[in-house]
Amino acid sequence: MRLSATDAAFLYSETASGPMHISSVFVVEGELTYERFFQHFAQRMHLLPAYKRKIAMVPFNMSHPKWVDDPDFDLSKHLYHHELPAEVSFQEALNFTVDLNEPMLDRSKPLWENHIVTGLPGLTFVLNRTHHCMIDGASGMELAQVMYDFEPDPTPPEAPPQKDVEQPPGQLQLYNEAVQDNLRALSEIRPTDWMPENAKQRELIQRASKVFTDFVTRPAITAPFNRSMVGPKRRADFLRRSFSEIREVRRAFGGTINDVVLTVVSEGMARYLSNHEQKLENKHMRVMCPVNVRTEDLKGALGNQVSAIFPMLPAWPMDPSSRLAAVRTEMENIKSNEDAQAVTMASEAGSGIWPLAMAPTQVVGTSLDPTVWAARFPLPVMPDLGWQPPNVGINFVCTNVPGVQVPLYLAGHKVRDTIGLLILCGNVGFSTTVL
């Protein structure tokens, strides 16, 4: 199966400083042993056949890579155990787990890993790392429910008979298939394919143009974490709040759950900026909010079914009710203008970019990877000289992935917390995940 243009883009854009894997840290109660952890996964791998496939790059990148069965699949090369010294603190254990998440995934095997970190009294950290070319946030939560249970002692799923694993295609076969696919795609192109079919599509295309033009005509503030390209180091913190508190605010002031969440996040960012910026009045922050466009028939499928919206919100501190009103107004405008649908259509229109242009990215993750040198010698953060060049990108990402509203268990151990670790890349040095 060949990767879609959207999925392949996460491979093409990956660097040593900006790995493209989605990660979560599950904090489970008690000490989970590696043996029990391994057994739990071994009993369920047949439910996730895609996790036994690896990437096959096409010679000269004549087409997007393919997923092929890994004949040498070894579960022990995807599950790891780390024992921390006694008397380690929660934050120290979290910092260690985040450090484990920093390197790129090995492209010579299926693009996922799980690590358990023990040593913290009464708790075990479980780090899941899966490449973004395999999953998005919504499908990641669906897949997590395959490995996690709703009760402490479920009946293990019955494994079907083992099937023979197909040998992966050779380089010549991959090249020939790519040429044939390209010729077939060219023969199916019609002159009218690039033309909108109706007034609604024309309207969405015009709206998409406006969305992306606004990046230039309405530049965002340059936050301290936007002043340089990100390096390879990461740091994570998390905050736990009752969902009932969010619902209470929504009932009292109106709007949606997402509006309330974005209000809290953006006001927190504005207060952070007020401690680092001299002038904030009339300046705005641009937030990227991924939008799940996965339809009912695609639930449980891998790959990416995601669009995005880019709300522009005041960068100066406000009282909470005024902040919520500003968020509601912006989000209602975005919804009425169908920005998410417009961005999706624009992305689909650009999916025909010839993969050959991405051929140089095939060295990423190899001994010839130039991005490794860039990661070793990251650029310094640009000092605040009283003036910054216009920021024609985003300031940060805020994703709100609906989590499971009932207790989850891993190998009999109750999950206490889930901490999302988002991708950082380019000059976007901060992100926040709400689960």
Residues covered by each model-derived region:
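Soluble acyl-CoA-dependent acyltransferase catalytic core bearing the H(X)4D motif
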Residues: 1-5, 14, 23-428, 435
